[in-house]
Regions:
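Short, glycine/charged-rich beta-strand-loop motifs at protein surfaces that mediate ligand recognition
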Residues: 111, 153-160
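Conserved nucleotide-sugar donor-binding
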Residues: 141-155, 192
């Protein structure tokens, strides 16, 4: 199954005090690079990064890590990124639908520092093709990444609004949960105090 990683990194990060796409971990490694690496190392054939707030600075980070020249990595800007995650998801799926022949998109968020390649591999392994709808769960709590087969892209794009992402679509088309709590917490980083030293 040919799968594209879709990294949503467009938000302003108001509670964080700035865009999460610009964050670095305690070792100076950019969250953007960490997430792109997790997707590629975990088995995605390519990665589309969706930017919005501070897009130019985020592109500079990709340049710094040499990802800007990586043919497996592309960038799309969500013009209406400030409407929430739904806008970023629509922009990313629109880009994939018009430029790729991937069977599925594995959607993740930039602010999940402990979601690594092992989680990506496990969720990808649970997919079966263009009809797949699988999401990571952490001790039973739904999270990201979420594998969305191509057959679901139109439905997700039609219902993705605000900060709910694909939730409305999932209420009518429940995804298969793929337990990953033994690999990661899946917790996001929302505030400066959430960053581990």
């Amino acid at each position: 199954m040919l799968t594209a990683g879709l990294l949503l990194a467009a938000g302003a990060g108001r509670r964080m005090g700035g865009p999460k796409a610009l964050l670095r971990d305690g070792n100076g490694w950019p969250f953007l690079e960490r997430a792109v690496s997790a997707l590629l190392d975990g088995g995605c054939d390519a990665v589309t990064v969706v930017l919005g707030a501070a897009a130019d600075r985020a592109r500079d980070l990709l340049d710094e890590t040499l990802r800007a020249d990586d043919p497996a990595v592309s960038v799309v800007e969500a013009p209406d990124w400030d409407e929430g995650m739904g806008a970023s998801l629509r922009a990313g799926l629109d880009a994939l639908a018009s430029t790729s022949d991937h069977d599925a998109a594995l959607v993740t968020l930039v602010d999940l520092p402990d979601v690594d390649a092992s989680v990506v591999r496990r969720v990808l392994a649970a997919g079966t093709g263009p009809d797949s709808l699988v999401r990571a769960a952490y001790d039973g709590r739904p999270g990201h990444p979420v594998l969305i087969g191509r057959e679901h892209w139109d439905g997700v794009r039609a219902t993705a609004r605000g900060d709910q992402g694909a939730r409305a679509y999932f209420s009518d088309h429940p995804p298969v949960d793929c337990e990953c709590g033994d690999l990661a917490t899946g917790r996001d980083v929302d505030r400066p105090e959430d960053l581990t030293p």
